Amino acid sequence: HGMRLTPEGEQVYPGLRQAFEQITASLAQLEAINARQTLTVSTEPSFAATWLVPRLGQFSASHPQVEVRVEATALLADLRRERIDVAIRHGLGDYPGLDVQALMAPPLIPVASPRLLAEGPEIREAIDCLAYPLLQESERNDWRLWLRAMGVEDDPRSERGPAFADDLLLVRAAEAGQGIALVREIHARAEIASGRLAVALERPWPSRFAYYAVSLPGAAQRAPLSLFLAWLREQAAAEA
């Protein structure tokens, strides 16, 4: 004999069934949320726009369960306070109390609009760049150091010119014909390939600065960050 509900049971059954279905649906939703892992990456706008974001689709295709959130900022993120899993920073790799992995050190190259170079004096040596307006990064160090590395004595002109906080802005200013910019090669690659920018002098300079993946101690061993870092190292190695 099958079990039969009492008249009272029949009255409450639809409500109970609905409640159980809701519980089942909520548990399934919770499982889906737990399976979906979020990873927050902080990096500078130029690196995000020209290098990281165009490649992210490959990572997402291989790891669909990981949802990457990219925060592009020129400010150094506080990993603990801002709940950031990994910061990709450009510097000397000196980040006390954090796990640091070197990624790559793109060389600095002088770029300008082809029209500006065609209409201006010929550039054969590094010193010839001083005949043009120089576009500076915020600290106004790169041109001075690059010229010195090329054997040019310190010249006050090496620190003059408008300054920009990010390579993306330097690239845009150079494209607009405002002068010669010294930028990391990876940030001007698309513009050079399309002919919007030209290399003013084939003297790439291996800057002491490099890109580093920085995370909280021990975090790099746990998924999803371990997966992301392995992918990042693989992508960076392909640049070398």
Walk through the language-model features, giving the residues of each.
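Conserved G/P- and acidic residue-centered "switch" motifs that form tight phosphate/ATP-binding loops
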Residues: 6, 85, 177
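Basic, amphipathic "hinge/linker" alpha-helix immediately C-terminal to the N-terminal HTH DNA-binding motif
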Residues: 1-22
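Short, well-ordered beta-strand segments
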Residues: 40-42, 87, 111, 135, ...
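A short, exposed helix-loop element centered on a Lys and neighboring polar residues
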Residues: 24-31
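Central regulatory/effector-binding core of bacterial HTH transcription factors
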Residues: 36-96
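C-terminal regulatory
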Residues: 81, 93-208, 235-240
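Short amphipathic alpha-helical coupling segments at ligand-binding clamshell hinges
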Residues: 51, 184, 220-234, 239-240
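Immediate post-signal peptide segment of exported/extracytoplasmic ligand-binding proteins
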Residues: 32-39, 130
